[in-house]
């Protein structure tokens, strides 16, 4: 597999097939049953769709948009586009219509692939603005203008392959490392999306370096549930396919829990929010059991934390702790592992800060959670923990082959083969994203994150540079760290820290209303209405006490003095979240400005 180091994403695919044509490369649900696809059949379908696109006139550097939920057709389309030397422009299936319109207007795609008629209806207002745009639905749609069926493209490509057997190899061999592979629009927590231009060499380098660094071996099983519109999941799929790991596509985020039990993955890429939900469910089950069950659960968590603190420093467990861990394993940890399929060897977490508590508990329970770090602009991974070197609280050590340094103001800077080519049609934004150096090759990309290295070379992220809160007393507060702590509460669904230029820090909190209603019933609170619950002083005091407990180790200036409870969850549709579920702080602060002001009236 490694005789020739692939330079493009197409070569990654071809090497994967050459290494095991008959192996089951992909699995997906069809009519409620798992269906497999061999590596050879995958390449055949990619070839047919690629040649079908070629027949339609798609050529090198043409841009092709994909607006679809993750699944095998997403990957086949992506590889087919790349095989032609064309450029994939993914659009999140949850992207607001006005942003879909913006992306289509700026990127000017030759074709738009869409998953379903429902998805087309959702963005119909945007599509009306582009009457000449040809649309390819994955599923047959009876009527509509400028529609080309996916099946017809694939069938036409198969005919062309039969007529000209060498054509696919000729076309795909003309794709080079420096060619543009994808324009990925970062959702951004403010302003319009920016199109990040990534080359084949950018993403190929990242996939190869990540696979080697993490020691991903053939024969593994992956469950894919994060959106392929995001470069993190997409790079992981390129990596897994190349290294002989079977990819299983979850039907949707709502089916992940059931899919895990059926697939029993050895590898997953995940986000902290999923781990937080699993952890909160564990806490709820233990609390509902009461008495001895709750005490055993709490004791087991303490054992997990102590075990992980030692094991991640490569220190042996003392005999007593080893015995305690074996007991806790039988009572609690085995059930937790079963909740994630029972075979997980590593979960790689990215996209947001991972609270140390979660990493310690899962790792101590035998589910190694490896936090990594990166951005769309860096293809995406910059650093990641490994099974052999997993320092909880850090995002790991840098990938081999790239450079990282910390600027004087604490900002993380990076350069190397992973760094993007610039923002599409935005030269000023591109220039602002890099340091000013005499030679372009010497420029450093400015990540916008604040961080530091420990003496052993592990990178720690403290916060987003633009998100740092400076209190009126001149103290800097990292909101994401505090939010991560608060989100561990079984009563908290979402939390946002506020307090810039204020005397103290406060928190806006969306409660977990299912758990809160159960607590309220036990306490004799005579309502289940959301707005009445958050107005009840007993509820406010209880959640504030839980926040105090979870943040007790913070410095005084970092501690939350007041909380404001919200009746509605932050959402993409509501405008408070990006498609990658990052909070748009400015939107939240504007929307709840009156409530925030009330948290600072009348003193502490």
Per-range role (PLM):
Residues 204-221, 228-333, 343:
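Conserved AMP-binding/adenylation subdomain of ANL enzymes
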Residues 186, 398-471, 488:
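Conserved ATP-binding/catalytic segment of the ANL
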Residues 56, 83-156, 542, 548-549:
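Structural core segment of the AMP-binding/adenylate-forming
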Residues 21-24, 158-185, 192, 215-221:
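Conserved pre-ATP/AMP-binding loop-to-beta segment of ANL
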Residues 95-126, 206-223, 253-267, 339:
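Conserved ATP-dependent adenylate/AMP-binding module captured primarily in the ANL superfamily
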Residues 5, 26-79, 96-101, 149-157, ...:
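Conserved AMP-binding/adenylate-forming core of the ANL superfamily
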Residues 118-177, 282-335:
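ANL superfamily adenylate-forming
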Residues 36-40, 174, 181-205:
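Conserved AMP-binding A3 loop
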